[in-house]
A protein has these predicted regions:
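Alpha-helical, largely C-terminal catalytic domains
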Residues: 1-242
Length: 242
């Protein structure tokens, strides 16, 4: 069966051309409390000295699908492959990076989507509103679920790593942002391969043009070359820099 997709669904809103994000706000403001109250079994226990309530929350990352494809991968699927990819930074890059920190960041960067979901530009949620939802979700995790676990230190560390990724100022965070894009391009190529040329996802490939580090650009070039060889002489949407 041919898969379906939404052309801008998996793109990072920060990388989209201006105008693709809608500034409209929901009539009923989104809140962590509202989502948590709707969870099966009710809200997890707050202010517990055990991390088990938080472990239950992580299940949502396993079951919440990434947007953009039918039968898409889960958020955890995406973050797990990203975490492994960080371990393969070539020496010219790894010598300048704290690789274990990058791996941790890859495993944390989309954690807020356990409650927020995988918001995409077509959802009509403005970037400030998206940031608000994700930030308040991380605050809920760290202040309500993890505040008494290891004296709150583990939760505070998760929050700090997530914020570092969001700020995208350190070399580690820039690398993980690039890995996020590479994982998307990998998935694009793999979905096309599974569909045996019945599905052209070339509209996703421009994401590669926003990769900043040369070593990761080299991976992207290899992937796009692989894609061209796969399509051969068959007409398809080609990668164009924007």
């Amino acid at each position: 069966m041919q898969a379906s997709f939404t052309p801008v669904a998996c793109w990072d809103s920060a990388d989209l051309p201006k105008g693709l994000l809608n500034d409209s706000s929901p009539q009923t403001p989104w809140s962590v409390e509202q989502v948590v109250a709707s969870l099966p079994g009710g809200p997890p226990q707050s202010n517990s000295s055990s991390p088990v309530p938080f472990f239950h929350m992580l299940e949502r990352l396993k079951t919440t699908k990434r947007e953009g494809w039918r039968r898409g991968e889960s958020i955890s699927d995406h973050m797990y492959r990203m975490a492994l990819i960080t371990m393969f930074a070539p020496p010219s890059l790894s010598s300048r990076l704290n690789i274990p920190h990058c791996t941790k960041m890859a495993l944390v960067h989309d954690m807020a989507e356990a409650l927020v979901g995988d918001i995409t530009p077509v959802d009509g949620v403005s970037k400030p509103e998206k940031n608000r939802r994700e930030s308040t979700t991380m605050d809920y995790f760290t202040q309500s679920l993890l505040s008494k676990v290891n004296n709150g230190m583990t939760g505070a560390e998760l929050r700090a790593v997530w914020q570092e990724y969001e700020d995208s100022e350190t070399l580690e965070s820039k690398f993980v942002h690039d890995v996020d894009k590479i994982e998307l391009v990998l998935q694009m190529v793999e979905y096309e391969r599974v569909e045996e040329k019945r599905l052209d996802l070339g509209e996703f490939s421009w994401v590669a043009s926003n990769i900043s580090l040369q070593e990761v650009k080299d991976w992207a070039d290899e992937l796009l070359k692989e894609r061209e060889e796969f399509w051969g002489g068959v007409e398809h949407k080609k990668f164009d820099k924007v």
